Regions:
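N-terminal small/glycine-rich loop or linker at the start of catalytic domains
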Residues: 1-17, 70-83, 109-111, 204-208
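N-terminal binding-site loop/beta-alpha segment at the start of enzyme catalytic domains
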Residues: 1-67
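Acidic (Asp/Glu)-rich catalytic clusters
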Residues: 2, 33-34, 56-68, 99-105, ...
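Conserved, mostly hydrophobic/aromatic
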Residues: 8, 25, 32, 40, ...
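Active-site mouth loops of central-metabolism enzymes
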Residues: 11-23, 77-92, 116-122, 215
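Short, acidic/polar
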Residues: 19-32, 86-103, 149-158
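Active-site groove signature of glycoside hydrolases
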Residues: 99-118
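Beta/alpha (TIM)-barrel catalytic core signal, keyed to glycine-rich beta->alpha loops juxtaposed to Asp/Glu
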Residues: 115-236
Length: 236
């Protein structure tokens, strides 16, 4: 895949950070694609399926060859309750369910979502082999893993056959307040694994908007970043 330097993270379409106007959300996706963004990342977990549903509506008028689509398996939710299921069967079922919500007949990149919530042995021995089988059938194009903890990503890469994991997605570790991912760039690149740097603004930490209550940053850092944002605004 030849992806644009900036991609469209569709978690916001699920109202993850704040409530959304669906029409404006759809317009935002269209503007992004028209502006050259060709990689879209989503998950059934975002908004408990809402993000995929809204994204599916937005993609109805976008030619399929204009974008690469990435979604995930493992994390879900219903009626405000978060759930996790990294079993092979649930992973396979989830892929087909996502395709239906998104209105597509294949997924360019399928990720195992936030592997820290699973037994890593299950990820390596059950979840990923199921997704690799879908890759071999042409249902998905590529297979990846995501997590906040870089060490978990490395562990899985070290415990699966070469070529199993084609991409990793890590968030909040390659931004102004945290550059831990830099220490691992060579490791992944030497293994031919693509790197997706998610949340370059640290999920709102480095913005005027501020962070939601569930943000993992310690309160002193939240307050320091808020002061920094106010300082930058004051300086124009």
């Amino acid at each position: 895949m030849r992806v644009s330097p900036l991609s469209f993270g569709a978690s916001s379409l699920g109202g993850v950070f704040h409530s959304i106007d669906e029409n404006r959300a759809i317009e935002a996706l269209h503007v992004a694609v028209e502006g050259g963004m060709n990689f879209i990342d989503v998950s059934p977990y975002y908004g408990h399926y809402k993000a995929e549903i809204v994204l599916g509506k937005a993609l109805r008028t976008v030619p399929r060859d204009k974008y690469y689509l990435s979604t995930k398996v493992g994390r879900y939710g219903k009626d405000g309750v978060n759930t996790w299921d990294y079993s092979a069967q649930r992973a396979v079922d989830s892929v087909y369910e996502s395709m239906e919500r998104l209105g597509v007949d294949y997924i360019d990149l399928i990720n195992v979502h936030d592997i820290e919530f699973a037994d890593l042995h299950q990820i390596a021995g059950e979840t990923l082999p199921a997704l690799v089988e879908l890759r071999e059938k042409g249902v998905v194009g590529h297979v990846g893993i995501t997590d906040l903890q870089i060490e978990n990503l490395v562990w899985v890469v070290n415990h699966v056959p070469e070529g199993t994991v084609e991409t990793i997605l890590n968030f909040c570790h390659f931004c102004l307040c945290d550059d831990k991912l830099c220490d691992w760039l060579d490791y992944f690149e030497q293994r031919g694994i693509g790197i997706i740097n998610a949340s370059p603004l640290s999920m709102g930490l480095l913005s005027e908007r501020g962070v939601p209550s569930w943000h993992p940053a310690p309160q002193p850092l939240v307050e320091a970043c808020s002061r920094a944002a106010q300082h930058c605004k004051a300086k124009g």
